[in-house]
Amino acid sequence: MIILAIESSCDETGVGIADLRDDGTVTLLADEVASSVDEHARFGGVVPEIASRAHLEALGPTMRRALDAAGIERPDVVAATIGPGLAGALLVGVAAAKAYAAGWGVPFYGVNHLGGHLAADVYDHGPLPESVGLLVSGGHTHLLHVRSLGEPIIELGSTVDDAAGEAYDKVARLLGLGYPGGRVLDELARTGDRDAIVFPRGMTGPRDDPYTFSFSGLKTAVARYVEAHPEASHADVAAGFQESVADVLTAKAVRAATDLGVSTLLIAGGVAANSRLRELAEERCAAAGLTLRVPRPRLCTDNGAMIASFAAHLIAAGAQPSPLDAASDPGLPVVKGQVA
């Protein structure tokens, strides 16, 4: 079964094509992405109206490239990110997916963007066993119990304020690194001393929920430190900030896996591309006897391939198509895999 999927939740226009085989395995056939990040950079963040217009302009050419790369003209299924995300951006992708599905006479599946991030990993590491999922991106930070990609996901905890990726962008802006800040801040942090400046670790006290995150206080602590120490090395500030984020994320994720008796930790989402997070996760998983799975960096960021993979797993588990009047949902919770 050939599944074509559209991703348009934020500032990447993605079209992915995957093959769901009879044995349940999923093979990637095409993964084409067009980004409007440069158009947003001068504003210091994503501008929803610009993102929506960029999707309108990029979707047709991106679709053509994906079909050509896969060597097909018509899939068996069309899927799309139906939420969560920016309202206007979602509308563009969902409307296009419905139109393609109707024109080709094939079923439409509106699926969860966050589930897609988890499902991207199967392209690199094969079928996903029961896992604890640490989902970290610009707008989301969740700890999840993933029994399988075809079953409802259980949320163990999330952030009470800023997402990890949001904190990265805000600190990068504070240090004058521009937008998007995650990759540039990561590169700067590698040249600094992560022990030179110790920033607070939010929600790690004895009375705090072990699976809940908070990064707003960390962001404020960095801002106050830079204001009080204008001569401080920005590389050391970046390294200290990054160490705080990676420390909290990995400690809570490893604890969740240990508490649940689950032997696999999956880290997914845009922040999963961060070098220190990956490094510290490897160290802590090895010490705890856990198997760590992290997609290649290209599959950590938004793309259509991940949506095709998640749709494939839902279909394999018996999910029925979404109606063509299914509405996009900017606030779709992570526990709801599909709008049916």
Curated annotation (Swiss-Prot):
Gene3D superfamilies: 3.30.420.40
Cell compartments where the protein resides: Cytoplasm
Residues bound to Fe cation: H113, H117, D302
EC assignment: 2.3.1.234
Cofactor (UniProt): Fe(2+)
Details of cofactor binding: Binds 1 Fe(2+) ion per subunit.
GO biological process: tRNA threonylcarbamoyladenosine modification
Keyword tRNA processing: yes
GO CC aspect terms: cytoplasm
Primary location: cytoplasm
Family matches, as Pfam families: TsaD
Top-level EC class as recorded in UniProt: transferase
Domain of life: Bacteria
Reaction it catalyzes: L-threonylcarbamoyladenylate + adenosine(37) in tRNA = N(6)-L-threonylcarbamoyladenosine(37) in tRNA + AMP + H(+)
Binding residues for substrate: L135, V136, S137, G138, G139, D169, G182, D186, N274
Keyword vocabulary terms for this entry: Acyltransferase, Cytoplasm, Iron, Metal-binding, Transferase, tRNA processing
Coiled coil: none
GO MF annotations, alphabetized: iron ion binding; N(6)-L-threonylcarbamoyladenine synthase activity
Record InterPro entries: ATPase_NBD, Gcp-like_dom, KAE1/TsaD, Peptidase_M22_CS, TsaD
Classification via HAMAP family: TsaD (MF_01445)
Family as reported in the entry's similarity comment: Belongs to the KAE1 / TsaD family.
Purpose: Required for the formation of a threonylcarbamoyl group on adenosine at position 37 (t(6)A37) in tRNAs that read codons beginning with adenine. Is involved in the transfer of the threonylcarbamoyl moiety of threonylcarbamoyl-AMP (TC-AMP) to the N6 group of A37, together with TsaE and TsaB. TsaD likely plays a direct catalytic role in this reaction.
Protein name from the UniProt record: tRNA N6-adenosine threonylcarbamoyltransferase
Encoding gene, per UniProt annotation: tsaD
